[in-house]
């Protein structure tokens, strides 16, 4: 097996192989996106499909089902982007159900005002990693997803 050694200078922030490493890492991670608004679901998928494998679901039940299917195939879903209001079910309920299965890195998103105590409780219980209010810019969303992917533990 060949070994590639990559060096960089931390102090002057010179990362000559950054583009190469980014290309190697492209599409290594799978995002499960769950939103019951078809336009938003398609928009998120289109915005993120260049960098990630995307699985789209439009209901809480489908989200849990697809998560289980991928787990059973031993395929890893890296992050779940989960809308808070999905039909009659809330995202915190879905997130708790997924946590009981095997846990996952979940980013909860919502266009609605959500009680800060609930969000803090979900984070403290390690049910979600982040909460993001809608609307959200593409750059901010990508930054939060990247932070979530590379975070090995819950903060």
Language model segments and positions:
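Alpha4 helix (beta4-alpha4-beta5 surface) of REC/receiver domains from two-component response regulators
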Residues: 93, 100, 113-130, 138-139, ...
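Acidic catalytic/metal-coordinating carboxylates
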Residues: 59, 89-93
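Acidic, metal-coordinating helix/loop segments flanking the phosphotransfer/catalytic sites
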Residues: 38, 56-79
């Amino acid at each position: 097996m060949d070994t590639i050694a990559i060096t960089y200078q931390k102090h002057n922030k010179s990362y000559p192989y950054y583009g190469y490493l980014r290309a190697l890492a492209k599409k290594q991670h799978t995002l499960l996106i769950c939103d019951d608004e078809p336009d938003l679901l398609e928009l998120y998928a289109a915005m993120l499909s260049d960098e990630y494998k995307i699985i789209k679901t439009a209901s809480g039940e489908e989200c849990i089902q697809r998560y289980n299917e991928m787990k059973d195939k031993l395929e890893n879903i890296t992050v779940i982007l989960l809308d808070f209001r999905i039909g009659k079910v809330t995202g915190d309920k879905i997130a708790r159900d997924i946590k009981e299965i095997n846990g996952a890195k979940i980013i909860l998103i919502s266009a609605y005002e959500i009680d800060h105590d609930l969000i803090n409780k979900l984070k403290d219980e390690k049910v979600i990693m982040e909460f993001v209010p809608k609307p959200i810019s593409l750059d901010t969303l990508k930054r939060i997803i990247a932070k979530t992917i590379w975070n090995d533990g819950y903060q």
